[in-house]
């Protein structure tokens, strides 16, 4: 039998993501966005020992802003994660990791509100409004950090990207990542869509198509598909195959049923 091996796409994913985990060139900047802290907390915790700067945006930034004592109106927030966000901010300080949060934001009464859109400092969010994007000053702040970065990982939008009025922050970050000279990895549907929209996908070192599997890998988790490839003693009677797809989420039983 021929040995079981990873396909070329899977090999490429592991090579690029592995470089970030093992020995990233400094300064190492991570940009994390999206709606929930829950979805990305594992990445932040796993990279705290190696990252220099973390830039946070999207709905999850609201939880961190609240942890710092900011009033965020009717914005999306995970109240049960506020203490965890505060702990992460404190741990980052101990490790000399710079976590940057939005300094200004785009607000409105709701997703469909076009008349009440306004930009304000995060300290001036009105009680009846929602934060729906990072503001222009935050984009400039994040651009400054990315300009001198040598390694950049970006996953998640900075606002409600699918609505044009709240897509400018994500687009601004996309341009900043693409125009940096860093080794760059971008993952997540909205992040990739932003790059495509501004026509700069070609300037990214690696666009990850691993989805949830790549996130788990960055969290430091052992992925079943990789474990099975490395497990020389497991079920020696099995028929070895070449796996040519990005199916690292599959466990051994899932893989057996798949084939």
For the regions a protein language model found, what residue spans apply to each?
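Active-site loop-to-helix "anion-binding N-cap" substructures in soluble metabolic enzymes
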Residues: 1-259
């Amino acid at each position: 039998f021929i040995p079981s091996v990873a396909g070329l796409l899977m090999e490429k994913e592991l090579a690029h993501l592995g470089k970030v985990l093992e020995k990233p060139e400094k300064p190492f900047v991570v940009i994390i966005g999206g709606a929930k802290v829950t979805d990305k907390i594992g990445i932040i915790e796993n990279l705290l020992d190696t990252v220099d700067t973390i830039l946070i945006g999207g709905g999850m930034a609201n939880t961190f802003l609240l942890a710092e004592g900011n009033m965020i109106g009717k914005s999306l927030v995970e109240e049960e994660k506020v203490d965890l966000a505060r702990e992460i901010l404190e741990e980052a300080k101990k490790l000399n990791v710079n976590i940057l949060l939005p300094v200004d934001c785009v607000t409105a009464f709701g997703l469909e509100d076009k008349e009440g859109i306004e930009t304000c400092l995060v300290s001036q969010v009105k009680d009846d409004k929602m934060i729906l994007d990072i503001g222009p000053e935050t984009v400039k702040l994040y651009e400054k950090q990315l300009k001198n970065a040598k390694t950049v990982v970006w996953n998640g939008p900075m606002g409600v990207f699918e609505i044009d009025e709240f897509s400018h922050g994500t687009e601004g970050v996309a341009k900043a990542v693409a125009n940096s000279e860093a080794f760059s990895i971008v993952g997540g549907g909205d992040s990739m869509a932003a790059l495509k929209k501004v026509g700069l996908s070609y300037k990214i070192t690696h666009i990850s198509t691993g989805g949830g599997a790549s996130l788990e890998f960055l969290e430091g988790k052992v992925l079943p598909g990789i474990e099975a490839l490395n497990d020389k003693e497991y079920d020696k009677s099995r028929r070895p195959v070449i796996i040519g797809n990005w199916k690292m989420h599959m466990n051994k039983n899932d893989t057996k049923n798949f084939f």
